[in-house]
A protein has these predicted regions:
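Active-site-adjacent substrate/metal-binding segments within catalytic domains
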Residues: 1-57, 61-111, 122, 126-127, ...
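Conserved small/polar residues in nucleotide/adenosyl-binding loops
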Residues: 441-445
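Substrate-binding clefts and catalytic carboxylate motifs of secreted carbohydrate-active enzymes
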Residues: 90-92, 115-118, 126-437
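Active/binding-pocket-proximal capping segment
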Residues: 42-45, 377, 418-419, 446
Length: 446
């Protein structure tokens, strides 16, 4: 809500995440407000409290990099003192995707920060979200300057709010664009034998090794460093079932933080699906203003992929139907970097009668059966939670039934086409509100 935080809004966000199966949040990539920490204390949500998104290396235009060396100790101490009496805070993170951590100076700063955390609070472990690929590139001299980044100097600052439209790419933005453009190359480079050297120094200073998109290195790194405790500090939703099983089955991996729980402004279109033409990997043109990868949208509605996660976690015990818009039936889909589908839970596509569209079912169990207006569209075995049908659009009721291995029904989901009449209703989420509080509501169209 802009630069302001409200108790009711914080409680609502944390409550929605908790209801959706999350048991921990990571403050990405700056400290959380007191209201958020109080909400986590009240509701029961673990917190990884994170201090910095940059250190002294250039990342972003004239930001904290300019002041890091003189301010980090004071700011880190303030964060720890704020968190000390909040039981929800279970660990501290001293940074995110800091490529300097592949250098001696960066490792020294990591050591000093970890020691300060231990001095002020020896009850909580310390981690850092290391982007393994970013460290590989930096160790090879292919850091920000080599790929178009710029070195920031205080003397250059004329207008802190100014930003040239053709300004250089830095940090995570640069790496994500490189990943999109050179996916095969990155996959070949991002192997355990390559990620070890540029990360073992900083990991040796931390209580818990934080891996950003580094799950391919978990197993080998554990073989080489059997006492290393790991956490997936940042991952995307690709292969999520496999990752969930990995975390459950490997005691040295304590958890997995997914990018991202709540939708946000900026990094425009990183999770937006295109058709026929890629309009940009990380900077799609206006009117795209959101990232498009939140499991909850800006006002807290669940995304299709959040339902998938709930099923994978075992929080939801029935299927979920999502449908691709039939207007794209003949188009080539171009997935976003952080999204593989734009299907939604709707069966209202007036004007597209008879056009085949993809119906995507996520479900627990062994198999599912889809019905359109009472007629079976067939039984399909689930593959990694999913089954897909091509169904000609016809207004009415689309329903799916999930079965276990003994063909016993375990749950249903249904979509009903909207009528021609539009009705706007507003319902409050609470019957009462505290004096001085803010009213939270959702609007529904039926």
């Amino acid at each position: 809500l802009g630069a302001a935080e409200y108790k009711e809004a914080a409680l609502r966000r944390i409550r929605r995440l908790k209801e959706g199966g999350f048991n921990a949040i990571r403050g990405a990539h700056d400290p959380r407000s007191r209201e958020v920490l109080e909400a986590c204390d009240e509701i029961g949500m673990y917190v990884m409290e994170e201090s910095f998104d940059v250190w002294y290396g250039s990342a972003g235009v004239y930001g904290y990099t300019l002041y890091f060396r003189e301010e980090w100790e004071k700011d880190l101490e303030l964060m720890i003192r704020k968190c000390f009496n909040h039981p929800s805070v279970i660990m501290y993170s001293i940074g995110n995707e800091i490529s300097e951590t592949c250098t001696e100076e960066g490792i020294r700063y990591g050591h000093e920060m970890t020691q300060l955390c231990h001095k002020l609070d020896d009850s909580r472990p310390v981690t850092l979200g290391v982007n393994l690929m970013l460290n590989i590139l930096a160790a090879q001299g292919k850091g920000m300057d080599a790929y178009g980044g710029s070195v920031m100097n205080k003397a250059d600052v004329v207008d802190p709010k100014a930003c040239e439209p053709d300004s250089d790419q830095n940090g995570s933005v640069l790496v994500n664009n490189m990943v999109a453009d050179f996916a095969d190359y990155m996959k070949n480079v991002n192997k355990p034998e390559n990620t070890d050297g540029p990360t073992k120094g900083i990991f040796g200073e931390l209580d818990i090794a934080g891996y950003n998109y580094g799950e391919a290195s978990y197993e080998k790194h554990h073989e080489w460093y059997s006492d290393r405790i790991m956490v997936g500090t940042e991952t995307n939703l690709m292969n999520m079932k496999e990752r969930i099983e990995m975390v459950r089955n490997q005691p040295y991996i304590i958890g997995d933080f997914i990018w991202t729980g709540w939708e946000y402004l900026g990094e425009c279109g990183v999770g937006v699906i295109d058709y026929n033409e890629n309009t940009g990997n990380y900077n799609k043109p206006y009117p795209c203003i959101v990232a498009g990868c939140g499991l909850y949208d800006l006002i807290g509605h669940r995304d299709t992929l959040e339902y998938d996660l709930m099923i994978a976690w075992g929080v939801r015990d029935k299927p979920h139907i999502a449908v691709s818009h039939p207007k794209h039936a003949q188009d080539e889909m171009i997935p976003g970097l952080y999204r593989s589908t734009d299907a939604i839970d709707s069966w209202s596509f007036e004007g597209y009668e008879g056009i085949e569209t993809c119906v995507r079912v996520a479900s627990p169990g062994k198999e599912v059966e889809l019905f359109l207006n009472g007629k079976s569209m067939g039984v399909k075995l689930l593959e990694d939670l999913y089954a897909e049908y091509l169904v000609p659009y016809e207004a009415g009721i689309l329903e799916v039934v999930a079965y276990d291995e003994n063909r016993n029904e375990i749950g249903r989901d249904r979509l009903v086409s909207a009528s021609n009449e539009t009705v706007i209703s507003v319902r409050t989420e609470k019957e009462t509100m505290d004096v001085g509080g803010c009213l939270l509501y959702t609007s529904d169209a039926a």
